[in-house]
Amino acid sequence: MKIIIPIKRVLDPYTQARVNKQTEQVDLTNAKMAMNPFCEIAVEEALTLKESGAATETIAVSIGTDKTVDTLRTALAMGVDRAIFIKTESELDLQPLHVGKILANIIKREEAELIIMGKQAVDNDNNQTGQILSGLLDYSLGTFISQFDLSSDASSVEVSREIDSGIETRKLNLPAIVTVDLRLNEPRYASLPNIMKARSKPLETIELDSLG
């Protein structure tokens, strides 16, 4: 089973945001950036599945400018097998539908059976990309997941999430998209040896225009 983990580069949550008075937008000039915290949880869950023998390969995918490569390197250092970088001129022009269409293209190409992603990015809090992907690909969908169990034959996953009345549990047949919540796991830190190894792991760059 091949797993794709879409990840996003965001302003470090522990950094004080600055606002550009002219544009009235967050000023990211020289700002400290990091992987979206929900994406870190998605990476951890994918790695756990790989280590259990349930997954054959884990692939991190991110869309953005050249600086996005640093975030992909972080995923590789955590243990992801390879990465795909979709290069754009600007990150600000991409809306969730655009992101969904780009990711759908890559998922089809890779023939991934399971997509694990953060429930939302902490910068815009859109909470739309997973749902859009499910519609575009006609994949099963589970959102806000706090518990995840793969079946013994790897044909389905049982997922749970918190709702107002308690815990909701559903079975999703693969292929499936799962968006994860903070309660699912505790992401690992990348060790120094793994940070060094990440430099030699495959990282493919694709120009956005080439996807059509």
What is each of the regions a protein language model found here?
Residues 1-212:
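N-terminal glycine-rich FAD/FM-binding segment characteristic of electron-transfer flavoproteins
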